[in-house]
Amino acid sequence: MKKISILGSTGSIGVNALNVIRKIPEKFQVMHLTGNMNTEKMIAQGKEFLPASITMVDIQAAEIVEKALKGLSIEIYSGRDKLLDLAGDKNVDLLLNALVGASGMEPTLKALENGVDVALSNKESLVVAGDITVSYTHLTLPTKRIV
């Protein structure tokens, strides 16, 4: 079973990734989910996938999610710093970076620095910092079969 973190789980790519995981739950354990402000989707995802943690970049959104998921064994965090911490979690096999724009660059680098495989849907990580991003690939390559 592969442990996966999804940055941007409430966006279209994150939602589609969770749809795949839903079809093959024996293959993946969702460890971390992150979002910005979409509390409704995040609450539903938290209840269904029971990740170890959820991080909402927006502090007020995190408070809403925390209240809704009270009683479940899910750690709720807020802020970009926490998102960066979990991006580098060495206990995760795969990080799906579905963040929009340049905001996804730093988490990508953090994961690669720590030897975490990255599934990148965020082209800005390559456009803005392609040389830097590629320079870390020796820490995760050769590519491993995920499913």
Regions inferred by a protein language model and the residue ranges of each:
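N-terminal glycine-/serine-/threonine-rich beta1-alpha1-beta2 phosphate-ribose binding loop
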Residues: 1-102
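Hydrophobic/aromatic ligand-binding patch that stacks against planar heteroaromatic rings
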Residues: 45, 110-111, 135-136
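Short beta->alpha connector loops at strand-helix junctions that form conserved
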Residues: 57-58, 121-123
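Conserved small/polar residues in nucleotide/adenosyl-binding loops
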Residues: 136-143
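Rossmann-fold NAD(P)-binding glycine/threonine-rich loop
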Residues: 124-136
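A short hydrophobic/small-residue beta-strand
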Residues: 117-118
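Alpha4-beta5-alpha5 switch/output surface of CheY-like receiver
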Residues: 104-107
